[in-house]
């Protein structure tokens, strides 16, 4: 099993990413040695165990084992914007506390990696466009873009 933590600043699109993962979802298996936590979204797809933790929770000391149990950390950001203080704080925290865990960045709401994100070019970066708007607060990401991320994860971490 490969644990994939999905995190990012509030409003970056974590839930949109999780909601956009193809169905059917299988049951999430809670990793060993982590505290009880109510996860907004958690599911398994084949051997990939996805779970979502928002940035304020991820940087809380009590949840550090949830960060450390991940085999890969997917950090979602608003790709229309520059890396903001919330993203930078989260990224720096993850780098400091989980330096040996592979990280990928997903720039949400865009199809192009802007120059402002070049600081992070040592990491795999994906762009995810909006696929379908359900209502003013809910959307689904582009199926093709989600598939590209899943293909990458399956070929590198399964």
Tell where the protein language model's regions lie, with residue ranges.
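Short acidic, S/G/P-rich loop/turn micro-motifs used as interaction or catalytic elements
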Residues: 12-13, 56-59, 79-84, 110-113, ...
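Conserved substrate/cofactor phosphate-moiety recognition/catalytic segment
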Residues: 25-45, 50
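Conserved C-terminal guanine-recognition region of P-loop GTPase G domains, centered on the G4
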Residues: 73, 79-123
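Canonical P-loop GTPase G-domain recognition
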Residues: 112-158
């Amino acid at each position: 099993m490969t644990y994939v933590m999905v995190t990012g600043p509030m409003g970056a699109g974590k839930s949109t990413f999780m909601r956009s993962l193809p169905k059917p979802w299988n049951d999430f298996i809670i990793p060993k040695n982590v505290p009880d936590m109510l996860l907004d979204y958690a599911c398994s797809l084949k051997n990939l165990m996805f779970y979502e933790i928002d940035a304020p929770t991820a940087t809380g000391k009590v949840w550090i084992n949830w960060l450390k149990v991940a085999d890969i950390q997917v950090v979602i950001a608003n790709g229309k914007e520059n890396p903001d203080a919330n993203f930078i704080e989260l990224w720096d925290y993850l780098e400091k506390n989980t330096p040996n865990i592979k990280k990928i960045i997903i720039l949400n709401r865009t199809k192009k990696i802007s120059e402002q994100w070049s600081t992070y070019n040592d990491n795999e970066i994906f762009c995810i466009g909006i696929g379908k708007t359900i209502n003013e607060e809910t959307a689904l990401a582009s199926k093709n873009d989600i598939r590209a991320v899943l293909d990458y994860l399956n070929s590198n971490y399964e």
